[in-house]
């Protein structure tokens, strides 16, 4: 039996999954130790990435390696086996909060310079820019995405359906999007013929040329596109829809993805803030200028910065802000008790989480009075607004989906090598003046030209040919494995998709598709086709580009399972390695708030269990380690029993939480290992563990639950004290002693 090269990298990330790791990782390391599998960690947390990027500001003892860069290189090798937990895609307010916390702990980091005054500050801002937004996933995702609900999870959801709000045919909820002037309407796209490099140039009205991006290398057959979001059209859209929401008597909400689309979406968010609160911004323009208020950071930035003003001036501005609410429509709230609105912070309302939540809740959001109400969902760009609109219309007509009977929608997502919009950040610009932006190749040919006005957002995206070939192959593989109708969600009327459709048709011809139902539909039609099947209890595989991959792998799991954290998320890396992502949910800051308040962590680690089983199976297949396969099979059995016996964490303090759920997984896993007969040595070593855990079950659960109740301080939110966190997450001495016997 070969156990060489059996190494799994388990990532240290942020917030709730990071806390859960303190409890779960020791179990994983204990159970894999005798099978020749090394489970190592790498810190890709937000705090860790900041420290890794500023070594010259730190003492020798404070410096840490750049784990993300290391994993990015590893992902391009056949040896890669990485379990990736959710991490923070940082907004600027979050980034500033981490910097402040680290500075308070003696790390002499530079402040984030929002408006750099010199070259040194420019350089600091550029370094921080690499850490903002979705800085982790594009580096690790050297493959396309295969996301699905495992059979055991889907069956559990059918047997224990989560709550779904009833829909009324009279619901006034609807999606509002632009009719023109958006990215969709302006997109132009070409396929590159022969490797080259391009410059992105801005040509002013007077003919002056400014270089926006130089020598961007492009491969043969790569698709590029460029599009523009018109500032004037966007502002007019916000003006119109805000007024309409008042007339229609619905809540007003805005759904963007300011975390991932870190350059474009905060700017769009800022325009909504300035339009909604235009009277306040006009009246106090000089004060806001002096304070450095940035609407792109939300109206919360105004509240934060006026705190420095003399009391009378501060109160005047607060009264003016309050007066706005009397003349404007009611806004959807993030926290009605605290008065936190949809427009407070750009990272508070993220479309892939906020829209499914509203769809589950009768198409409503929460108003300022703490009650649910029909809502206008503003999704400015037409590229993806129609998909959400189709779901709203379907539910209004047909009622809410039934989790006990509905089908499932696995996704095959194109994302390798920073595909499409999610690789666009270094090619997205807010235009300082009117003119033309052109993409010019090394031969001087103009590939794409776009007219722009001052304040418009210009965005160029790219997708390489090899990832598209791999994506088509993965789609055919899943269609063949399941026999499920498989739909490419592509719109021939969109510039980029028109090029994609040509490639999909070409590469589908390379595969045997006999007997398979594979079709290409524009996203709204694809969504309607899928919804109709799912409502009848039938399945449909969605094959999508990068953004829809992100949106649909939240939308359907949340409707089907109540959460996207329970998805199996496999990224078969293009060079033979494996990346195993634990669910599609975020890092759950609200779970941490509850943990700090009453030492109860409700994070559900099911995503980690599923990813670990897939990772162990990958070890078995790639290294011939037979014990890894036994560990994977028994873990699957344990996870099934975990679901059947309902040992997921409760939301209520004093009941089973994340730590208790880990104990039950460990007990069921040990029992399964003790029951298998393929490897008698492994069976013998786990028999005593299974007996001890079974015998001490009551005592261990009592010890774990007894820790709950009082508030807990880990001396840090983003950069907790590891000793305190370990102590807090492993409070059962009995359990710890039994585990230590395996090491």
Swiss-Prot record:
Its EC number is 1.1.1.42. The keyword GTP-binding does not apply. Its cofactor is Mg(2+); Mn(2+). D-threo-isocitrate binds at residues 134, 137, 141, 147, 257, 422, 549. Gene3D superfamilies: Isopropylmalate Dehydrogenase. Binds 1 Mg(2+) or Mn(2+) ion per subunit. The keyword Zinc does not apply. GO terms for biological process: glyoxylate cycle; tricarboxylic acid cycle. Keywords: Glyoxylate bypass, Magnesium, Manganese, Metal-binding, NADP, Oxidoreductase, Tricarboxylic acid cycle. GO terms for molecular function: isocitrate dehydrogenase (NADP+) activity; metal ion binding. It catalyses: D-threo-isocitrate + NADP(+) = 2-oxoglutarate + CO2 + NADPH. NADP(+) binds at residues 87, 89, 137, 587, 591, 602, 604, 651. Mg(2+) binds at residues 352, 550, 554. Belongs to the monomeric-type IDH family. NCBIfam families: monomer_idh (TIGR00178). Catalyzes the oxidative decarboxylation of isocitrate to 2-oxoglutarate and carbon dioxide with the concomitant reduction of NADP(+). Monomer. This is Isocitrate dehydrogenase [NADP] 2. It comes from Colwellia maris.
């Amino acid at each position: 039996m070969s156990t060489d090269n059996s190494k799994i990298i388990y990532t240290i990330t942020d917030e709730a999954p990071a806390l859960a790791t303190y409890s779960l990782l020791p179990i994983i390391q204990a159970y894999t130790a005798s099978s020749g599998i090394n489970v190592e960690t790498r810190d890709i947390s937000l705090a860790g990435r900041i420290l890794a990027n500023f070594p010259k500001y730190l003492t020798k003892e404070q410096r840490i390696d750049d784990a993300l860069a290391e994993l990015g290189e590893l992902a391009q090798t056949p040896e890669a086996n990485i379990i990736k937990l959710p991490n923070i895609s940082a907004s600027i307010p979050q980034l500033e909060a981490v910097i402040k916390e680290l500075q308070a702990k003696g790390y002499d980091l530079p402040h984030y310079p929002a408006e750099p005054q010199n070259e040194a500050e420019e350089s600091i801002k550029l370094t921080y820019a690499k850490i903002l937004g979705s800085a982790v996933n594009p580096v690790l995702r050297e493959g396309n995405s295969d996301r699905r609900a495992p059979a055991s999870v889907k069956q559990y959801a059918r047997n224990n359906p989560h709550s779904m709000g009833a829909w009324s045919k009279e619901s006034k909820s609807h999606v509002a999007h632009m009719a023109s002037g958006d990215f969709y309407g302006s997109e132009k796209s070409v396929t590159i013929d022969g490797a080259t490099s391009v410059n992105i140039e801005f040509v002013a009205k007077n003919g002056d040329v400014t270089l926006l991006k130089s020598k961007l290398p492009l491969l043969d057959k790569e698709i590029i596109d460029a599009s523009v979001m018109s500032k004037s059209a966007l502002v007019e859209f916000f003006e119109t829809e805000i007024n309409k929401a008042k007339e229609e008597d619905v809540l007003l909400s805005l759904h963007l993805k300011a975390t991932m689309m870190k350059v474009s979406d905060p700017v769009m968010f800022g325009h909504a803030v300035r339009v909604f609160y235009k009277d306040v911004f006009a009246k106090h323009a000089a004060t806001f200028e002096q304070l450095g208020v940035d609407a792109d950071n939300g109206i919360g930035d105004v509240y934060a910065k006026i705190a420095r003003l003399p009391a009378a001036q501060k109160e005047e501005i607060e009264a003016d802000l309050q007066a706005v609410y009397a003349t404007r429509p009611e806004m959807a709230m993030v926290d009605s008790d605290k008065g936190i609105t949809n427009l407070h912070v750009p990272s508070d309302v993220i479309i892939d989480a906020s829209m499914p939540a509203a769809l589950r809740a009768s198409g409503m959001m929460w108003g300022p009075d703490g009650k649910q109400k029909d809502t206008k969902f503003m999704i400015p760009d037409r590229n993806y607004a129609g998909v959400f609109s189709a779901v709203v219309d379907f539910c209004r007509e047909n009622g809410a989906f039934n989790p006990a009977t509905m089908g499932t929608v696995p996704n095959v997502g194109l994302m390798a090598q920073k595909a499409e919009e999610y690789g666009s950040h270094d090619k997205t610009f807010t235009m300082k003046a009117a003119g033309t932006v052109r993409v010019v190749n090394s031969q001087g040919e103009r590939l794409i030209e776009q007219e722009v006005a001052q304040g418009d957002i210009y965005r160029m995206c790219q997708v390489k040919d090899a990832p598209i070939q791999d994506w088509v192959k993965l789609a055919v593989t899943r269609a063949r494995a399941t026999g499920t109708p498989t739909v490419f969600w592509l719109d021939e009327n969109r510039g980029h998709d028109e090029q994609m459709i040509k490639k999909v048709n070409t590469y589908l011809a390379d595969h045997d598709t006999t007997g398979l139902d594979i079709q290409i539909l524009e996203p709204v039609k694809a969504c309607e086709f899928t919804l109709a099947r799912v409502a009848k209890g039938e399945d449909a595989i969605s094959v999508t580009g990068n953004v829809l991959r992100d949106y649909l792998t939240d939308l359907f799991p949340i409707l089907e399972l109540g959460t996207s954290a329970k998805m199996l998320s496999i990224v078969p890396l293009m060079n033979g390695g494996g990346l195993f992502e634990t669910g599609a949910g975020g890092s759950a800051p609200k779970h941490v708030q509850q943990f700090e308040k009453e030492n109860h962590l409700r994070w559900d680690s099911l995503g980690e269990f599923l990813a670990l089983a897939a990772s162990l199976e990958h070890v078995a297949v790639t290294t011939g380690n037979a014990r890894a396969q036994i560990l994977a099979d028994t873990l699957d059995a344990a996870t099934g029993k975990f679901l059947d016996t309902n040992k997921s964490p409760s939301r209520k303090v004093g009941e089973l939480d994340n730590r208790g759920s880990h104990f039950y997984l460990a007990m069921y896993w040990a029992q399964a290992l003790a029951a298998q007969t393929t490897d008698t040595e492994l069976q013998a070593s786990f028999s005593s563990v299974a007996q001890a855990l079974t015998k001490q079950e009551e005592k261990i659960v009592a010890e774990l639950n007894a820790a709950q109740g009082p508030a807990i301080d880990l001396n840090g939110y983003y950069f907790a004290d590891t000793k305190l966190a370990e102590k807090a997450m492993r409070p059962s001495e009995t359990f710890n002693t039994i585990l230590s016997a395996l090491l």
